[in-house]
């Protein structure tokens, strides 16, 4: 098995390499979300600013940038952000309008709110459990609701979409849908849908 290799999806290219915990740096089941985001961005009829939180190696970041969006990619792991930059470069998007941020996602969103920054779309893929760069503890069951509420405050007046992914076995997709409906749907309108992804 090679140390790393490239995978192509449509006009996107990703570097894949086996890591601990059976990760490869790519979640191919997310392609349905990449397609959704690219379609929304391409048909928005306006410039789109996307905030990608817990952005990992940047699959969604690269897809949104390919569709023409300005993207802010945030992950607490420096190595994942570097990998995301490499995926953008491999996809011919090395000079695309992407901000690469190594930070705790909640703290970053709080600062963006104070700065008056807004985004037309948010993609988030929070872990079940994790630690931020400053040792901050994240537990999805405890932190998701207040985190989505916080994120709703950085959305523009006419948001295009919000995508929330979770691999936490204890939370049904309907629970995530309910949280989005309560905190985003009621505030901005639109349609909230949920489903399970698989290969």
What do these predicted regions represent?
Residues 158-199:
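C-terminal catalytic and target-recognition region of SAM-dependent MTase-like enzymes
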Residues 28-46:
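Conserved alpha-helix/loop element of class I SAM-dependent methyltransferases that forms part
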Residues 45-56:
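Conserved class I S-adenosyl-L-methionine
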Residues 52-53, 73, 101:
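Conserved SAM-binding loop
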Residues 78-80, 102-105, 119-150:
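Mobile active-site "lid"/loop adjacent to the S-adenosyl-L-methionine
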Residues 1-28, 35:
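Non-catalytic substrate-recognition/targeting regions of SAM-dependent transferases
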Residues 77-123:
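S-adenosyl-L-methionine
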Residues 57-71:
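Conserved SAM-binding loop of SAM-dependent methyltransferases across substrates and taxa
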């Amino acid at each position: 098995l090679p140390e790393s290799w490239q995978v192509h999806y449509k006009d996107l290219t990703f570097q894949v390499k086996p890591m601990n915990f059976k990760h490869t740096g790519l979640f191919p089941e997310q392609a349905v979300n990449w397609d959704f985001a690219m379609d929304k961005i391409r048909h928005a009829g306006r410039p789109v600013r996307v905030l990608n939180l817990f952005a990992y190696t940047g699959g969604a970041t690269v897809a949104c940038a390919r569709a023409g969006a300005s993207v802010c990619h945030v992950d607490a792991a420096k190595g994942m952000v570097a990998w995301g930059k490499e995926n953008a470069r491999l996809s011919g998007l090395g000079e695309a309008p992407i901000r690469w941020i190594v930070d705790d996602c909640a703290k970053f969103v709080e600062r963006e709110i104070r700065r008056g920054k807004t985004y037309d779309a948010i993609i988030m893929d929070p872990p079940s459990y994790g630690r931020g760069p400053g040792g901050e503890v994240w537990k999805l069951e405890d932190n998701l609701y207040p985190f989505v509420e916080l994120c709703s405050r950085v959305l523009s007046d006419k948001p295009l979409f919000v995508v929330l992914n979770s691999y936490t076995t204890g939370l049904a997709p309907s629970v995530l849908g309910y949280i989005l409906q309560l905190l985003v749907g009621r505030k901005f309108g639109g349609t909230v849908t949920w489903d399970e992804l698989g290969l």
